[in-house]
Amino acid sequence: MRIFHLITHFSLGGAERVAANIAESQTHGMEYHVVEIMRGRTAYTPKFIAELEKAGVRCHRSWMPDVSFHFLFERIAALLFPLRMLYIMLRWRPDVIHTHTETPDLALYVFSRVFPRMLRRVKIVRTIHNTRLWTGLPRTAQCVEAFFKSHNANIAISDSVRDSYAERFGEVPPIINNGVAEVEQKNYFNISTPQGVHLSQVHQQHLNTSGGALVSSAPTTPPLGFCRLPEQEHLNILFAGRLEPQKGVVVLCKVLKMLAGDARFFFTIAGDGSQRTLVEQTLAEIAAEGKPLNAELVPPIFGLAGYMQSFDYLFMPSEFEGLSMLSMEASLNRLPVIANACPGLADTLPADWSLLAHGNNIDDYRRIFNLLPTANRNALTQQAYAFAKERFSVRTMQERYEAWYKAERSIC
């Protein structure tokens, strides 16, 4: 059986990670391909492709540049996709086409309108990764969702995704939870090449050694987690993800200001996106006030799951999620999560999880961070690990999708 996954780009993203985890299945008789709609061009791209090819997955690159501007280039890519997809259909004759996120969803819908007969013998599968779809595009939503519902294609990744889809589009899709795996750990703070550039290299005029701010491009924080040093006095907090409104970047900046100069904590902010400037400005303002800078901004970390035990806590003030892969990976790799109790994120943590804020309330975060220095981190780690281990297995996810590919009708 030949399965084609359509993703936005070969780059860092939760949906791309899910597609890769499915496609890397070694089930006999399954041949996996991954097709990008827009050409990934990040530092992560060649590593992502190499990982897939090592697992025997064939990767199909796009020539359409990956540019984000009010979903304009994504729509252009979708409109140009049919001719490229026609070649794929004639050359490879896939048995299953599996789409992930709005850009591939739209691209396949456009192909179905241009070449309606080409999909008659192809099973369509579509994973819904988010609780919010087609923001600002109601007419597009109506057309695309009608297409996928007519093919009985929809699969949700969590209860919250299923419920939000049912409320808006009137269908209750089955659920297949995302799967994650435990990863061999390395020391992030003891690697030969720094993972990123500190803010000190962007706003050098604000930073000086007399104020205790960072002035070096090499990490100055001692290692934590599996290689914890006894003299380490502060807690190392990781924020990792796209610097976009969905991820709660505004709240992150408020917390950075709230804890500015607090020697109990050090924040590593790993990410990039449209709100990167906001983070840079926040850290520059803190430094300009003469407070010791207890944070650094670095690019996204490739293979992040393999560095998680280098940190004490993961901070996730997301406004909404589908089903957070990052939170699941953190729990399974023994990194406790401080999170906003939003749909898709709260689903990944125990019901009685004590590190949850509600409505991204700053007072909740103040209370949580004040409790951290005396919290029983080992107990928190084990609680989250046991929860994730029981619910989120990569192999279980692969087997359920492969059963769905083979089935004539719904089996979830």
Q: What is the predicted role of each segment?
A:
Residues 5-73, 166, 273-274:
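N-terminal strand-loop element at the rim of the active site
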Residues 13-24, 235, 239-258, 274-277, ...:
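A conserved mid-protein helix/loop that constitutes part of the nucleotide-sugar donor-binding site
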Residues 99-105, 128:
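Short His-centered aromatic/hydrophobic patch
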Residues 160, 179:
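Carbohydrate-associated surface elements
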Residues 300, 319:
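Aromatic "clamp/platform" in nucleotide-sugar-dependent glycosyltransferases that forms part
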Residues 336-339:
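Short hydrophobic beta-strand element within catalytic cores of glycosyltransferases
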Residues 351-363, 370-376:
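Conserved acidic donor-binding segment of nucleotide-sugar-dependent glycosyltransferases
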Residues 378-406:
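A charged, aromatic-enriched C-terminal amphipathic alpha-helix characteristic of glycosyltransferases
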